Amino acid sequence: MEERRCSFCNTRITPGTGKLYAKKDGTVYYFCSSKCEKNMRLGRVSRKIKWARKGA
């Protein structure tokens, strides 16, 4: 299986978990949790969030 990483916090996503979000333009985002998905949609930058930097 291919190893996937969260598009927001960069943590490893175990197979069978997480969420895949595909935009109409073909961009694909992988999220480990709804927390990461919501922060990405709000336009937050993971560099500025302490808990998200720990996964990088």
UniProtKB/Swiss-Prot annotation:
Zinc fingers classed as C4-type: ranges: 6-36
Matching SMART domains: TRASH
GO molecular function terms noted in the UniProt entry: rRNA binding; structural constituent of ribosome; zinc ion binding
One GO BP: translation
Ligand binding (Zn(2+)): C6, C9, C32, C36
Gene3D superfamilies: Ribosomal protein L24e
Cofactor(s) listed: Zn(2+)
Cofactor note as given: Binds 1 zinc ion per subunit.
Keywords: Metal-binding, Ribonucleoprotein, Ribosomal protein, RNA-binding, rRNA-binding, Zinc, Zinc-finger
Keyword Ribonucleoprotein: yes
Family to which the UniProt record says this protein belongs: Belongs to the eukaryotic ribosomal protein eL24 family.
Subunit structure: Part of the 50S ribosomal subunit. Forms a cluster with proteins L3 and L14.
HAMAP family: Ribosomal_eL24
Role noted for this protein: Binds to the 23S rRNA.
Protein name (database record): Large ribosomal subunit protein eL24
This protein's encoding gene: rpl24e
